[in-house]
A protein has these predicted regions:
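Short, well-ordered secondary-structure "scaffold" segments embedded in the functional core
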Residues: 1-137
Length: 137
């Protein structure tokens, strides 16, 4: 199971969940086919799997790769650390969704739309957990 997921950095909740695709599809191709739109002026932190995917009106932050046979400048290393510190929040969000084993294990159900429903339930449970985690009792 694979789909695109947009999460909020402030509340660590799933904001957008794309339709489920087969797991073998590349991340960039998945985003190109979906045509996900973002609000103007949004910041997008992504990994190198989305290299070449352009989103109009969005500030894209992507880590720099070390040049072949060379070294990465100290400024780029510092930028990569900053991007990684933001992206780790989203990686933890994805791990929170994958606590539901139906999402991360081999999915053998062939009923139409059941894979989307399972992913929606997993994201809903994650949002429920994070909502109560950040509330004052």
């Amino acid at each position: 199971m694979k789909n695109s997921l947009v999460g909020g950095l402030d509340d660590r909740q799933v904001k957008y969940l794309g339709p489920v695709h087969e797991g073998k599809k590349h991340d960039k191709r998945l985003c190109d086919e979906e045509g996900t739109r973002f609000p103007a002026g949004a910041a997008l932190y992504r990994d190198s799997a989305y290299q070449g995917h352009e989103v109009p009106g969005v500030t894209v932050h992507q880590p720099r790769k070390k040049p072949r046979g060379g070294e990465l400048p100290a400024e780029d290393k510092a930028t990569n650390r900053l991007i990684s510190s933001v992206r780790v929040v989203i990686e933890h969000l994805i791990a929170g969704v994958k606590r539901c084993r139906v999402v991360k294990d081999v999915f053998r159900n062939t009923k139409e739309g059941f894979d989307d429903l399972a992913m929606e339930l997993a994201c809903g449970l994650h949002n429920y957990r994070t909502f109560w985690r950040h509330q004052d009792y």
